[in-house]
């Protein structure tokens, strides 16, 4: 149990609401903005590459600060950091919608996004951590299921909500809608946490600020590398520099943390093979999920001719599958302790089946095939995400719950960015190759282009199928007994 376990049903419900709000809003803001970028670009007279920094800077700051936020949770306590996270997020959201419009300054939008990203980073880390810390063991899987389901729903609905808000109001309201939710969450934070919430487990004395700086630079450079590599060119100076910074930042961080008295990340977590396997499984699953979620709107709009709104409706099939399976996984988790790897295997097989269907798409394929593939992937993710997240959090002692939550958050956040970039590279390379060797000349050019592009999509989804097979094999090596030993290792 966590160090402040609560038993009251009402208090448990409020804790779950607080965690769900944090995860939902942080996930929603990761996808709601992208669809408004063309409008923002037009309003400020910006190029596509310049306006993309609205999304890029949020990504870099959020990912780079995850481990720092995990450390702050352990130092200051859940209540203070929860309120701080929503305060930064709410102020940043209001500033994003207000200051750039009033003052006509695009740089102010980027500065405001930094504040919003810092708040979002706290929310990503603290949501699963408060579930692990406050809920009884038998309630944790159910609580995490609700939190993760809402996060997935927010990710899927973000573009649709963003499109509707931009079309019928204006892009500023994409940020303004966060404000009342943020105020409500701050009020909730003052009343929901037990009085002893802020009992300190660690202090900032001896805090490894250099390590925090190194991992921030390393992770930010890594995500910049993958998010901008295709557009800037893999041999361009910014990308080469980001490779150098990635190696220097992450390499320097690992060396530093081995020597630090009070490390930002306890590397002893990764001495346990089962912990490493669980983290890799989590990363691979979220990577291929993000890749599919990124590519399918292009297939639905360019090949099937759907509108943005209708394409978004098809994509909600994934969220439906995830919510159903997540609910079931939360209910059966406690009954399957000792046999959880079989739940992971079953979920992975469903993910693989979904990617198999998507890898067989044609320009004339029915939308039912796409929806079925998405439902299967969603079901598979639901059956794997809840037990994986729960196992990661349970592997940490209470004083390092924030650290474990940071690892869990990073292994969702970073692989999604990398997965999108990798699938994009595969698509471009596949289309170029197919266009070069395809000798079909009897069909209209538009039909040939559609066939080639669809074949590129199929190649990406086939790679997703292969990676799902790799995950299935890794599941055989998951040992819950060995995973339970992590807590003893990092507590020494």
Each language-model region and where it sits:
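Intrinsic disorder in cytosolic terminal tails and internal cytosolic loops
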Residues: 1-11, 198-203, 445-448, 478-492
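Transmembrane-helix bundle of Major Facilitator Superfamily
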Residues: 2-192
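Helix-boundary and loop/linker segments of multi-pass membrane transporters
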Residues: 4-12, 102, 204, 232, ...
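Flexible interhelical linker loops that connect adjacent transmembrane helices
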Residues: 5-6, 186-216, 258-273, 334-335, ...
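12-transmembrane solute porter fold
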Residues: 14-21, 28, 33-35, 48, ...
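Structural signature of transmembrane alpha-helices in multi-pass secondary transporters
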Residues: 26, 55-58, 62, 116-117, ...
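Interfacial helix-cap and linker-helix signal at transmembrane-aqueous boundaries
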Residues: 40-41, 72-73, 96, 161-169, ...
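C-terminal membrane-cytosol helix-exit motif in multi-pass small-molecule transporters
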Residues: 180-198, 216-228, 245-259, 471-479
């Amino acid at each position: 149990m966590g160090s402040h376990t609560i038993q009251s049903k009402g208090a448990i419900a409020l804790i779950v609401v607080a965690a769900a709000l944090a995860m939902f809003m942080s996930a929603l803001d990761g996808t709601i903005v992208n669809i408004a970028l063309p409008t923002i670009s037009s309003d400020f007279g910006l190029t596509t590459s310049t306006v993309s920094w609205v999304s890029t800077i949020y990504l870099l700051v959020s990912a780079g600060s995850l481990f720092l936020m995990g450390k702050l949770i352990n130092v200051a306590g859940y209540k203070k950091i929860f309120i701080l996270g929503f305060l930064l997020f709410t102020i940043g959201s209001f500033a994003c919608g207000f200051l750039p419009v009033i003052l006509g300054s695009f740089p102010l939008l980027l500065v405001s996004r930094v504040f919003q990203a810092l708040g979002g980073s706290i929310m990503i880390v603290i949501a699963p951590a408060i579930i692990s810390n406050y809920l009884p063991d038998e309630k944790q899987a159910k609580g995490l299921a609700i939190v993760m389901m809402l996060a997935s729903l927010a990710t899927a609905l973000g573009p649709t909500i963003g499109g509707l808000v931009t079309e019928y109001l204006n892009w500023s309201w994409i940020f303004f809608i966060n404000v009342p939710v943020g105020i409500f969450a701050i009020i909730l934070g003052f009343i929901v946490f037990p009085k002893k919430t802020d009992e300190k487990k660690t202090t900032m004395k001896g805090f490894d600020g250099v390590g925090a700086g190194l991992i921030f630079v390393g992770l930010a450079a890594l995500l910049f590398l993958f998010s901008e590599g295709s557009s800037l060119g893999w041999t361009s100076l910014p990308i080469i520099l980001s490779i150098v910074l990635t190696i220097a930042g992450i390499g320097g961080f690992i060396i530093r943390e081995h020597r630090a008295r009070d490390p930002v990340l306890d590397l002893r977590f990764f001495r346990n093979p089962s912990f490493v396997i669980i983290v890799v499984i989590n990363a691979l699953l979220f990577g291929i999920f993000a890749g599919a979620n990124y590519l399918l709107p292009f297939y639905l709009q360019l090949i099937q001719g759907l509108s943005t709104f209708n394409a978004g409706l098809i994509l909600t099939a994934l969220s439906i599958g995830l919510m159903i399976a997540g609910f079931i996984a939360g209910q059966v988790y406690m009954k399957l302790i000792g046999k959880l790897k079989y739940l992971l295997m079953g979920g992975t097989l469903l993910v693989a089946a979904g990617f198999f269907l998507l890898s067989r798409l044609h320009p004339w394929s029915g939308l039912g095939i796409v929806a079925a593939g998405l439902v299967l992937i969603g079901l598979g993710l639901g059956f794997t995400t809840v037990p994986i997240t729960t196992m990661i959090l349970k592997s940490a002692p209470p004083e390092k719950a924030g650290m474990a939550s940071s690892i869990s958050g990073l292994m969702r956040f970073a692989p999604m960015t990398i997965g999108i970039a990798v699938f994009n590279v595969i698509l471009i390379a596949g289309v170029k190759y197919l266009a070069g060797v395809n000798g079909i000349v009897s069909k209209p050019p538009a039909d040939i282009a559609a066939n080639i592009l669809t074949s590129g999509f199929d190649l990406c989804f086939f790679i997703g199928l292969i990676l799902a097979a790799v995950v299935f094999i890794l599941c055989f090596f998951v040992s819950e007994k060995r995973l339970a030993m992590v807590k003893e290792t990092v507590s020494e």
